[in-house]
Amino acid sequence: MGERIKSTMDLLIYLQNSHLATGFGFNTNLFETNLINLAVVIGVLVYFGKGVLTTLLNNRKETIVNTIRDAEERYQEATEKLNKAYTRLEQAKAKAEEIRVNGLAQMEIEKQELIKAADEDSKRLEDSKNATLRFEEQRAIEQVRQQVSRLALELALETLKTRLNRDLHAQMIDYHIGLLQSMESVID
């Protein structure tokens, strides 16, 4: 460092003595240049300004520390909120999965119930169809029976008309009278 000061001083001396520096030059006389006055003023400023500067720097430091502390608190709050949000997200995912599984189970239950109800309806319809068929069959049989009976009666009447003459008619009357008399004697 001393070498540097010496070279700077040599340069200043050279510039002062050089013919190029006739209008410009450095005054190396300390008393003429008020260097002492400047040093005193700077010293007073440093001595008394040190408190102000220290206060300003301390205030600035405190502001920076408070800002950092606030930023850290906000970071912690944001981290907590993020963790809570992740927790709620996981809970929502779990709830959605539970709802999906329950929905599938409920859907399967309802499917089975619908199949069972359809089977029951089909059985009921089959039973109803069978009952209707039996009823119609019975009705048809009854109609056939009635027609056969009517035709048999008509045939019997026709046969009676053609075969029934006076002698046969008298024999039948006598036969029935005999039956009635035998019944009367059994009753007495």
UniProtKB/Swiss-Prot annotation:
InterPro entries linked to this entry: ATP_synth_b/b'su_bac/chlpt (IPR002146)
One Gene Ontology term, aspect cellular component: chloroplast thylakoid membrane
Topology in membrane: Single-pass membrane protein
Recorded superkingdom: Eukaryota
This protein's record includes keyword Plastid: yes
Annotated TM spans: 35-57
Record bears the keyword Translocase: no
Miscellaneous: In plastids the F-type ATPase is also known as CF(1)CF(0).
UniProt subunit comment: F-type ATPases have 2 components, F(1) - the catalytic core - and F(0) - the membrane proton channel. F(1) has five subunits: alpha(3), beta(3), gamma(1), delta(1), epsilon(1). F(0) has four main subunits: a(1), b(1), b'(1) and c(10-14). The alpha and beta chains form an alternating ring which encloses part of the gamma chain. F(1) is attached to F(0) by a central stalk formed by the gamma and epsilon chains, while a peripheral stalk is formed by the delta, b and b' chains.
Protein name (database record): ATP synthase subunit b, chloroplastic
Species whose genome carries this gene: Zygnema circumcarinatum (Green alga)
Name of the gene encoding the protein in the UniProt record: atpF
